[in-house]
Every structure is written in C-alpha cells, then in structure tokens.
UniProtKB/Swiss-Prot annotation:
Full protein name: Large ribosomal subunit protein uL30
NCBIfam families linked: rpmD_bact
InterPro entries, alphabetized: Ribo_uL30_ferredoxin-like_sf, Ribosomal_uL30_bac-type, Ribosomal_uL30_ferredoxin-like
Lineage: Bacteria, Pseudomonadati, Pseudomonadota, Gammaproteobacteria, Lysobacterales
PANTHER family to which the protein is assigned, alphabetical: LARGE RIBOSOMAL SUBUNIT PROTEIN UL30M (PTHR15892:SF2), MITOCHONDRIAL RIBOSOMAL PROTEIN L30 (PTHR15892)
Gene: rpmD
GO cellular component, as recorded: cytosolic large ribosomal subunit
Molecular function per GO: structural constituent of ribosome
Source taxon at top rank: Bacteria
Length: 63
C-alpha cells in the first residue's frame, strides 16, 4: 500500500543565499541544501511542502 508520504521530490537550489533573510536560509538548510545546484531527494510531506513554499524563489522542484 502506497501512502501519500512515500512519494519523494527532488529539490534543487538554483539561486544563491546571499542577501536572503536568515529564516529562509534556515529553511534551505532544513531541506539539506547548501550550495547552488545542490540536489536532494526529500519526502513529500506537508512540512517539507511548507519549507519549499517559503523558499520557492530559490529552489526548483522535480517530481
């Protein structure tokens, strides 16, 4: 049985963190990203979706 949370998303950092508010930097770090073009697979949960929504202008999402 596949749960909604078993899905994963690929998140890629596409913009630099220079000049970005500190809260947004922390959100990017919570996603496991640190350098431009870093890519991580993260679980598709409401918490992760909230982090991505907060920094949507810094990241690119692939299914």
């Amino acid at each position: 049985m596949v749960h909604e949370y078993d899905k994963t998303l690929k998140v890629c950092l596409v913009r630099s963190l220079i000049g970005v508010p500190s809260r947004h930097r922390l959100s990017v770090r919570a996603l496991g990203l640190s350098k431009v073009s870093d890519m991580r697979k993260v679980n598709d949960t409401p918490q992760v979706r909230g982090l991505i929504n907060k920094v949507h202008y810094l990241v690119r999402i692939q299914d």
